[in-house]
Regions:
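Short acidic/histidine-centered micro-motifs embedded in hydrophobic/aromatic stretches
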Residues: 22, 64, 241
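Polybasic low-complexity intrinsically disordered regions
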Residues: 48, 52-187
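Helix-centered, glycine/charged polyanion-binding patches within enzymatic domains
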Residues: 169, 174-240
Length: 290
């Protein structure tokens, strides 16, 4: 069942019903998902599995692949790990209507970009420089990014430390700029690389963005800040190639499961690329799809 949920993301199949049709019609699909015979489970069987498995078991797939990647030295071969911190919006699975309306009670209205708002969730993620997510937290879209820094920075250092590594730099965009965030990062023994907004009078760092979004300041910090795109690359891979934006589940637990499956696919690709001796394909999801 878990293999089928991964296969669903790789093949960009939008719903469980269409997944079942693909499994029924295509023998190769049943073989990949390890279903024997000529018949595949029905969509209600998958729905029952998802409900009974729970978020812990589904997220266990992500953590298992992530830990395997750490042991193989895929996530970051260096002892000092640089991480990038950011969040991305996911539209809630809901629609208006007196008779056919669907609601997601846990979702809230939040920013999708600078000017637009929608009902949804935000995935707050810490990613390595190899564009692989180390850990993540899912919250309603109206929760401030800075409020999730503490839980994210409590989990990531513990995980990295298990493999004899430490976090040396935390790179983030200017919405994370605050004295509390800087203090939390420095408490870990890491250096914050977060530009200050234009309205700050006494900045904590020699790094800022111009009106045209060009980064200025200390050349060393400018070079480090440009590494922030690693977390954006992981979001891009999830949304464009693994249907991370095609959220068809409701409730925070199932949204976490959806994100865990997408991130697990990224690790599956990275691990397979290294095992076949093609590490340059570690971030190429398209190279491993039909």
């Amino acid at each position: 069942m878990l293999l089928a949920l991964l296969f669903m993301r790789f093949e960009a199949i939008p719903s469980l019903r269409k997944l079942c049709r693909r499994l029924e019609k295509r023998r190769y699909a049943r073989e990949i998902c390890e279903f024997t015979g000529d018949r595949a489970p029905k969509h209600n069987t998958f729905s029952l599995f998802i409900s009974r498995a729970g978020s812990d078991r589904i997220e266990g797939l992500f953590t298992g692949l992530r830990d395997q990647a750490f042991r193989m030295g895929i996530v970051d071969p260096e002892a000092s790990v640089k991480v990038s911190l950011d969040s991305t919006f996911m539209k809630a699975y809901s629609r208006r209507g007196r008779k056919g309306g669907i609601g997601d009670r846990g979702a809230r209205v939040g920013k999708t970009d600078r000017r637009n708002y929608e009902l949804g969730w935000r995935v707050h993620t810490v990613a390595s420089m190899s564009a692989l997510p180390i850990n993540y937290v899912v919250r309603a879209a109206n929760v401030n990014d800075k409020d999730l820094v503490d839980p994210l920075l409590k989990q990531a250092p513990r995980l990295v430390k298990r493999y004899g590594k430490r976090i040396s730099h935390v790179i983030a965009d200017r919405q994370y700029y605050s004295a509390d965030v800087f203090a939390a990062v420095r408490k870990l023994g890491a250096e914050p690389v977060i530009p200050y907004p234009s309205n700050v009078k006494d900045p904590l760092i020699d790094l800022w963005l111009t009106k045209r979004f060009k980064v200025k300041g200390d050349p060393r910090l400018v070079g480090l800040y440009r590494l922030r795109m690693s977390v954006e690359r992981s979001f891009k891979a999830g949304k464009l190639e693994l249907m991370m934006e095609n959220l068809r589940w409701r409730g925070v637990a199932k949204v976490r499961m959806h994100v865990a499956i997408c991130f697990a696919c990224m690790y599956a690709v990275a691990i397979l690329a290294h095992r076949i001796g093609r590490p340059e394909l570690a971030n190429s999801i398209a190279a491993f799809t039909y």
